[in-house]
Amino acid sequence: RMGYAPSKPCKPLFIDDSASAYLHLLYQNNERAPHIDGLALAYAHTKVLEVPDRPIRPEILRPLLAACRNGLRLEIEYVSLNTPNVEIRLIAPHTLVYSGMRWHVRAYCEKNRQYRDFVLSRLRGNPDLLDASENTRELDEDWNTEVPIIFTPDSRLNAAQQCIIETDFGMTGGKLVVSSRKALVKYVLARYQVDPRNQATNPEAQQIVVSNIKELRPWLMHD
């Protein structure tokens, strides 16, 4: 197979020359690689674990996007684990969010009179677009306010093990500080596989903990 080999002075123009940038590019283009000439070789020794898609109908997504873009209210049919029977909700959505495992929409809920997350795969029927809403993204305090999440190695690990964990997660001074919107704190913890309710009995399995968990508890309520 013909191709180009970079010389030592060669510098990439569209990404930086870090390993993380290249690996991120591999991840982003994994699904397209078999269909694009020239990418197949780069991906021949790469395997990305994909999360199965949750079924979301276009008839649900289209009005959601329109409501987000135009600041409109939306009438939806929704089910949840607490309310398994279909319930009519009036919401004012403003942002679609992918947590790494599922899609949800951040929206003002007129029933509960607060901003909440609605899982897209739990919407039923066809949403109806209504009039403009006064409850916009600008009024969603938990969305517009960021807090630091401080990860540290599990203190039950010995010094050598903690040093390995610090390197694994790119920690500085023994901690990794991740800034997050308040509304997304619980999803960030899930991405780092930290369950704030249950600590693993094996510190080698736990690996990292959140040192400022008390300050974050107001935003750890689960749906």
Where are these regions (language model features)?
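Basic, Lys/Arg-rich alpha-helical nucleic-acid-recognition elements, primarily the DNA-binding modules
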Residues: R1
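Short, solvent-exposed polar/charged micro-motifs at secondary-structure junctions
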Residues: P6-P9, P84-R89, S211-L220
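Bulky hydrophobic/aromatic content
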Residues: P6-V79, R191, N198-N202, V209
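Short, charged low-complexity intrinsically disordered segments located at boundaries
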Residues: P12-S20, R54-I56, P93-Y98, K214-D223
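Short N-terminal signal/transit or membrane-insertion segments
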Residues: H24-H45, V97-V105, L157-A159, M171-T172, ...
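Core beta-strand-centered patch of the WYL/Sm-like small regulatory domain
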Residues: Y43-A160, I164-E166
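Polybasic (Lys/Arg-rich)
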Residues: N144-D223
